[in-house]
Amino acid sequence: MEITASLVKELRERTGAGMMECKKALVENAGDIDAAAEWLRKSGLAKADKKADRVAAEGRIATAQAGGKAVLVEVNSETDFVAKDENFLAFTEVVANAALNSDAADAEALKSVKLDSGETIEERRAAVIAKVGENLQVRRLVRIDSANNVAAYVHGGRIGVLVELKGGDIELARGIAMHIAAMNPPHVKASDVPAEFVAKEKEIELAKMSEKDKAKPAEILEKIISGKISKIVNEVTLYGQPYVLNTDQTVEQAVKAAGADVIGFQRLAVGEGIEKVVEDYAAEVMKQAGLA
């Protein structure tokens, strides 16, 4: 069968692969476009395997929501350049929507979720790797499914937050989500702070005190320490922090004024916890030249 330009173009549009790759696939499969597409998919999987050991620490946080059901996904790339690529961005949206419409509990379970095209998320990932030339990872998935107010907020594609708010309204929930994105509180309220953390901070504050202060009566010393610990606890709790949308009140005051309560939240930031590889090209060149 003759391999025409229109056939190559059709396969390219269908798979997103390069023109020369599409032509080769058609030649290898006697012009059968379905077989050629499958051949490219298999080729894409091979390329994905070669890139699997590269560190993917850039990327994007994407969200999808339907009423009180919302998800955040983190999809990683190796470079910020690819994180802005239209193929990568489209893939993150596909992943987020697939997560929303599935019952996958985590990123590992999400890999086997099937798309309308019949592909799994993992197969689509491999196909996108073939297009962009970098290792990509669907790293994390978090979700909230509730009858309460649920807000999803993504800042610049780098930080994403889900908030569940009992009472109040969706506008307040979104404001709280924006605050969490900006301030990154580890806990909702003081009662959520581990006792071990409080004990350690007391120990640190006591060690920092002067001998003169340590000599004060026990009840006075306890008040001084308690005041310092209260300030620290406020810093690490959502409720204790000044509300970024109105710094005249704390988040707790804003929430309670609306007769509401924050049930919980999820926050993801691109690449957190991933150790990035720092390339020392000068040292690499010297090593290759036998100078190091």
Curated annotation (Swiss-Prot):
Q: Which SUPFAM superfamilies match?
A: Elongation factor Ts (EF-Ts), dimerisation domain, UBA-like
Q: What is this protein called?
A: Elongation factor Ts
Question: Which purpose does this protein serve, as stated in its record?
Answer: Associates with the EF-Tu.GDP complex and induces the exchange of GDP to GTP. It remains bound to the aminoacyl-tRNA.EF-Tu.GTP complex up to the GTP hydrolysis stage on the ribosome.
- Its Gene Ontology molecular function terms? translation elongation factor activity
Q: What Gene3D superfamilies does the entry give? A: 1.10.286.20, DNA helicase RuvA subunit, C-terminal domain, Elongation factor Ts, dimerisation domain
- Which UniProt keywords are given for this protein, alphabetically ordered? Cytoplasm, Elongation factor, Protein biosynthesis
Q: Which Pfam families match?
A: EF_TS
Q: Which family does it belong to?
A: Belongs to the EF-Ts family.
Localization in the cell: Cytoplasm
Does the keyword Cytoplasm belong to this entry?
yes
* Annotated Gene Ontology cellular component terms: cytoplasm
Give the taxonomic lineage as stored in the record: Bacteria, Pseudomonadati, Pseudomonadota, Gammaproteobacteria, Lysobacterales
Annotated PANTHER family: ELONGATION FACTOR TS (PTHR11741), ELONGATION FACTOR TS, MITOCHONDRIAL (PTHR11741:SF0)
Q: Where is this region: Involved in Mg(2+) ion dislocation from EF-Tu?
A: 79-82
